[in-house]
Amino acid sequence: MNRRIVATIILIFSISVALAAKKGFTLVIDAGHGGHDAGALGSFSKEKNINLNVALAFGKPVESNCPNVKVVYTRKTDVFVPLHQRADIANRNKADLFVSIHTNALPKGARAVGLETYTLVMNRAAENFDVAKRENSVILVEKDYQQHYE
């Protein structure tokens, strides 16, 4: 059953990208965290490094196989990019799709299974606001963050 769900999701995503690629499409790939913001820390890895590797590995075949898809990265090296700049990159490039890559840490010996996908749902504003506050707490490590956010 799980394989059917995954196969269906991949098929739908592939068809969507293929149709969009015919018209011209801008995909912004955001490797979450970076620089002094390590993200989750594993016993032998940092989230920022995994995210960067996944983002580059995700973008490469799109660049190679979809000539009408413009791929834009928020970062290609281990640098810190403030959240407002990531949004500016997407807006400046008129992104059709913004994908932010993040990974989780696990306790030693635990096995990872599955994935998480987050999308904005407008009818649950209070709950969404709590999630947004938690997820965007990285803003507090930005230099002069008060100048960029309300």
List where the protein language model places each region.
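Sequence-pattern detector for short linear motifs
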Residues: 6-7, 89
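Positively charged n-region of N-terminal signal peptides that target proteins for export
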Residues: 1-5
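Catalytic-core regions of hydrolytic enzymes
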Residues: 20-149
